[in-house]
Amino acid sequence: MAQQEKNWDTSYEWKIILLLSITFGLVGLDRFVLPIILQSPNSTMAKDLGLTPQDGGTLAGYLGMAWGISAFVMGYLADRVGRRAVLVPAILVFSLMSAASGMVGSLMGLVFVRVIMGISEGPVASTGVAVAVEASKAERRGLNNGIFQCMISLFGLALAPLIATRLLENHSWKTVFMLVGAPGVIVAIIMWFVVREPLKRADTGHGGGGGPFLSMFAHRNAKVAPLTLICAMGGIFVIAALLTAYLTAPVGAGLGLDPVTAGNVFSAVGIGGCIGQFAMPALSDIIGRKISTLASYILAAVFLYFFTQAGPDNTTTLWILLFFASMFNFAALAILAGPVAAEAAPPGMLASMAGFVIFAGEFVGGGISPIIAGRIAGGEHGLKGALYFAASGLVVGFVVALFLKETAPRKLRA
C-alpha cells in the first residue's frame, strides 16, 4: 500500500469492513438457508419439487465446486479489471439467484440456479479478501478479515435457522427465498460508490512466458496454504453435511436425539464458528499466523474426537465440545483464507491468491470430502466413522501447516 501510516484512512477501512460483513452475512444466509427450508416441516419445497435429502447434498456439492472455481478465476480477473467490476455484479447476481431459487419448478432448474449462485459467490470471497486487505492497516489484517468472515457462520449457521423458520410460519418457501435475496441488491449499489481500486494492478502479461501467473506461487505459503485449507474445509463441510444425521440417528448408529434437541446442539456450530473466525485471526496479528493455525487444527481435532466419544445423556457436554471443535476449525479456515493467503501474494495479485487458496479448499474440502464421508457413513464404519474421517483430516492439516512460513507483520518486525 502506498499510503503512509500517518495518513491512513481509518474511516474508509471501517466502512469497507462493515459493508463486507453485511455482504458475507448475506452470502452465508443465501448458501445455508436452502437445507433449512428443504427440511422444515412448515415448508412444502421437497414435496413441490420432488426432492430427497440426497438431492440436498447434491445441490450443496455443485454450489461448493462452482464457488471454488469461480473464486480463483474471477479473483484473477479482479486483479486485472478492478475490484468493483467483479465484486458489484457478483453481489447482484447471487442476490437475484437466491430470489430465483423460489421460482424454479424442478430439481434441474434448482441445480442450475444454485450453480450460478456458486459462480457469483466465489468472487465475493476472493475479491472481498483483497478489498479488505487493501483497506486494512497491516497490524489489523487478521482482525478485519476475521470480522467479516465470521458473518458467514453467524448468519448462515446461527441466524439462518431462526430467520427461515420464522418466515415459513407466515410465508411460502418461494416468498422466503425472494425476501432473503432482496438486501443484496441494496448492498451492491452502495459497494459501487464506496470501494476504491488498488493503486497497483497485476501485470497483464505482455512480457510473455506466463511469468505473472507463475509468480503467484513463488512464496512457500502459496503452495502450503491451499493444501492445508483443504483439511479445514473438509472438517467443516463433513460436519455440516452429516451432523444432523448423527445427532438424530438411533442409538448405536448415532445419538438418538429428538429434532428440537438436535437443533439446539447443532447451534454450537454456528456460534462457535463465528467466534473462532473472529477471535483467532485477530490473535494471529499478535502471536503469528503459523502458531495460531497449528493450535487451531490440533484443538479442533481433539474436541471433535471427544465429541464422538460423548453420549446422548448430557446435551450440555455435547454442545460445549461441538462449540470448541467448530470454533477452532473455523479459526483455521479464516486465518488461511484471509491473512495467510493475502500475505503470500505478489504485488497486484491479492485476489488471485485468495481465490486460488479458496478454490482448493472449496473444491476438494467442500466438494469431494463430504462425498467420501458419505461413503464412509453408508458403510460398516457408519456416521461416527465419517466424523473420525473429519478429525483425521484436521490432524493432516496440522502436519501440513508445520511447513507454513510466518508472515504476520508484527512478528516479522520483532
What is each PLM-predicted segment?
Residues 142-161, 168, 358-369:
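Glycine-rich segments within core transmembrane alpha-helices of 12-TM secondary carriers
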Residues 111-153:
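Cytoplasmic helix-loop-helix junction between adjacent transmembrane helices
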Residues 347-379:
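A late C-terminal transmembrane helix in Major Facilitator Superfamily
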Residues 182-203, 400-405:
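C-terminal membrane-cytosol helix-exit motif in multi-pass small-molecule transporters
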Residues 35, 39, 220-277, 333, ...:
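Extracytoplasmic gate region of multi-pass secondary transporters
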Residues 290-339:
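C-terminal transmembrane helical hairpin of 12-TM major facilitator-type secondary transporters
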Residues 69-107, 284-287:
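Conserved MFS/SLC helix-loop-helix module at the cytosolic interface between two early adjacent transmembrane helices
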Residues 2-10, 199-226:
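Juxtamembrane intracellular "pre-TM" segments in multi-pass secondary transporters
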